[in-house]
Structures are given as C-alpha cells and as structure tokens.
Amino acid sequence: MTKIAFIDLEIDGRGKILDIGGVKGESRFHSAGVSAFAEFISDCDCLCGHNIVEHDIKYLRPFLKKEYVLIDTLYFSPLLFPHRPYHKLLKDDKILTDELNNPLNDSLKAKALYEDEVSAFKALDKDFQQLYYDLLGGDDHFSGFFRSIEYVPSRRPFFFRKTTTDESLRELLRGKICEHSDVASLVKNHRVECAYAAALITADDRNSITPAWVLRNYPDVEALLRGLRAANCGDPGCAYCSKKLNA
C-alpha cells in the first residue's frame, strides 16, 4: 500500500527553510529541523503538497535520503473542481489557511484536498479518467497522483483498434466544440492545456472560468478554448457551431 507524507514548508526570501510541517497517518511533524524531517518521512513512498513540484521539493531535495514520488494537489485541482466557487480550500494557487506561517496546518489542508481530489477522480466517467491519464500521465506535475492511487488505464483487447487520445477527446466533447477543430494538433502540442480546457468545457457552467494561475502557467489555454468554441466553421452540419454560434 502506498504510504504518503503530506508536507508544507515556510521559506524565507533567501531560500532558507524556516519551518516544516508534515503529516503521515496519525503522526505529525512541526519543526525547523530538516534532518529530523528527512527521518520522519523516510518510510514513505510519496510526498504530497500544494505546488510541491515547483516549490517545496527544490528546497528539500538536498536533505532527502532517497527519491520520492511527488503528488501535487495544485495542478489537479482545476481538473477535478472546475465549477465556481471551486474547492473550499483553494484561492487561486494557494490553500486557504486558518493561521499564517503554520506549515503543519497547511499540511493537514493538503491532505484533505488530496483526499477530495481522489474521491472526485474516482467519481469521473471512466473514459474521462482514461483521457486525463493519456494526456497527463507523462508529466511530472500529474504523474505522481496517478501512481499514488495505483491507477490502471483501460486496455482494450488486441483485436480492437486502439482509440487515439485526440479521438477520445473529440468524442467526449462532441456537441460542445466545433467538429472541424484540429484536435489532433492540439493534443500533440498542448496536452496539459487540452486537459484544462476539457474540464472547463464539460463543467458546462457559464460562471466558471480558468483560474488565474493556470493562465499564468499555461497561457495557451485561452487561445485553445477560443479555437474550439468561438470560431464558427460555417458548416450547417456542425452541431456545435450551428446551434451555439449561429443562434
């Protein structure tokens, strides 16, 4: 069974670790002692945190005794909670906290968010689970999540033709995007952006928007959405354009 430590760091402006919070099972850690923390997490397989891939791990890695699978709750949150008002623990790219500068408290929040993300992923349609895995399984920001839940992608019998990722995306968004969109090119060049766009489109909520941090990190999401949903192909046979853009 995968053992996960949920972590958060407080870092000063010079990159020094000032405080560390950690949770594994019923055990808690709250101290500035990096060596003691490395020992605390040494029996775990995974480290989970909010923005751990781009932030926490670069400060921790020099002190760790081994490599860990990294689970980042930040990058999955827009996929699994696309409806406004998003998740109750989130504000843009930050976890909402009850206390400033309390990494133990934030570690507990990261644990709660991860558990909600796992539940939300398991509640998705199986085809959408497969789509997200196909689009994101090779990206370090997402791969740890799939490993932590031991996700096994569907395998069709060898005598069936394998459905490509772009075909799956087109089918799952049928009637919600222009039928003449160059989905194959988008999937080839913008896999993460396709996943975020698909989540927003299927939310089917006019009030939902792409979170600001996603647009900062993946600015092509907006152009991709416009290409899929705002460019009228003029074909009367296109279910989306004829209904939504010619109305």
Describe each model-derived feature in a short phrase:
Residues 1-247:
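DEDD superfamily 3′-5′ metal-dependent exonuclease/proofreading module
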